[in-house]
């Protein structure tokens, strides 16, 4: 239960870091195919038509890029997706703390984790922030070194 609750905030950063590791090893096309596999697995969890549409369109775009475009474009696309994941990961954590500050303790994931573990919710928010910013810093370092 604890891992499931924490996964929503740490998942994008972890996926971005894994993608950065693949790019650091010059595996841009491999990253695109790994994303296709993850999108196919995501179809199991889709609960509505909008989710199905979103996953199928995303998969079609990733497939099209990985199959028909030039290697430079594939690499640029893979880097763009990775930067998006890494740069976007800290924002929900900041929004979580803003919501908690305005409304007080809520039913947020941090508050649920506090109830499950007896660790204060603010500590969980801090952990999420350190983990997502750390993943951003490490992933950025790997990608910048690989691109140089």
Which role fits each region the language model picked out?
Residues 1-44:
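Membrane-embedded helix-turn/re-entrant segments that form the catalytic/gating core
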Residues 46-148:
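C-terminal membrane-associated helical module and adjoining short loops/tails
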């Amino acid at each position: 239960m604890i891992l499931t609750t924490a996964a929503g905030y740490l998942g994008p950063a972890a996926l971005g870091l894994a993608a950065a590791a693949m790019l650091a090893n010059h595996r841009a096309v491999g990253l695109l195919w790994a994303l296709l596999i993850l999108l196919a697995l995501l179809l199991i969890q889709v609960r509505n038509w909008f989710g199905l549409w979103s996953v199928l369109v995303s998969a079609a775009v990733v497939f099209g890029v990985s199959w028909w475009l030039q290697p430079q474009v594939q690499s640029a696309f893979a880097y763009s997706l990775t930067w998006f994941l890494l740069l976007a990961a800290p924002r929900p954590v900041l929004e979580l703390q803003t919501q908690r500050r305005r409304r007080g303790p809520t039913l947020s994931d941090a508050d649920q984790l506090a109830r499950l573990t007896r660790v204060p919710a603010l500590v969980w928010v801090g952990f999420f922030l350190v983990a997502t910013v750390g993943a951003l810093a490490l992933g950025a370092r790997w990608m910048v070194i690989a691109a140089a």
